Amino acid sequence: MIHWIRSTESFPPIEEALNDPNGLLAAGGDLSPERLLDAYRHGIFPWYNEGQPVLWWSPDPRMVLFVDEFKVSRSLRRSVSRGDFDITVDSAFGHVIEACAAPRDGRLGTWITAAMIDAYTRLHRHGYAHSVEAWFDGKLAGGLYGVAIGRMFYGESMFARLTDASKVALVHLIEMLKQRDMPLIDCQQQTPHLARLGARLVPRRVFAEAVARLVNSPQPVGAWSIAAPPVAEVP
């Protein structure tokens, strides 16, 4: 049974999510900053297609990346060492999320609808959503965005117009998270690409316990800044 939630109602317990499709917990509600932050604090995220109601998910198991387990290939290490890209943070959030929403691989669109773009842009203005940008010759070549609450980071999407652009942005994100004592990235869905970067599956119960602990650890809210890691310190 899928729970239908109205704008004033709370989420049901994540243990009540469906097994098939894995993790579908509820439908309805809205994408207000308050609703989104409440969802993330409970290990829930929105994912739906244009024309559907908002669908809320909490899959079991959950794909996560512990920052200390991040894997950097030799080619990526060389790209970082060469300084192929100029990296900025929170300087082009709107451009990053719109690029992530653009059709790719022959598909007509992505799950990042216009309503989602508006919602996460509001979160960015509130200081919770962040972007990392990779620039080449003054043009945006790749990047990523996600949500930070306390010491927890929730990865949302990434894009690349040039080889390794998004991965170099991820290297810098990992360094920033280490500096902020933020040990865990929620990757939401299992993919071979994430596994190659060091992400792995954990039981939903374990993930929820980690989230409950990390989101309640105080961290400043607002725009981030970056100090590029020395090449010798790149994992």
Which residues does each predicted region cover?
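N-acyltransferase acceptor-side catalytic subdomain
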Residues: 1-235
